[in-house]
Amino acid sequence: HERAFFQYEALIVDKDISFSSGMVMIQTIFEKVFGKKINVRMREGFFPFTEPGYEIDMECLVCGGKGCSVCNHNGWIEVMPGGVIHPNVLKSANLDPEEWTGFYINIGLDRLVMMRYGVDDVRLFHSADLRFLEQFK
């Protein structure tokens, strides 16, 4: 984790949004960013605005899921928290949680860019190394 980071929050709210709807949203984003289907896994996590909440990982594209220093040798990289929106969040938006549901994600953009371009160290994005930074013009 870095002191400064960039994130993108997304949520969908409707009358029949489910965990499956959230997975479709995640897969669609990944397919648009990477141009292919990406293996995703969900681990239980706690976030006060979701119920249930998940840590969402993607297969490490630097090593193809085989394990490397980028993914801590386990083949996966954590890219976002997310989950089904907590009923209290819906209530605060004047939505009846008996009628409305939603799914929320918070994408770590630095990590997606790392995977998209095969960058092996997130700290490079915040460095003053112009040789590295200028390749993203």
Model-derived features with residue positions:
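TRNA-recognition modules of translation machinery and tRNA-sensing kinases, especially anticodon-binding
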Residues: H1-K137
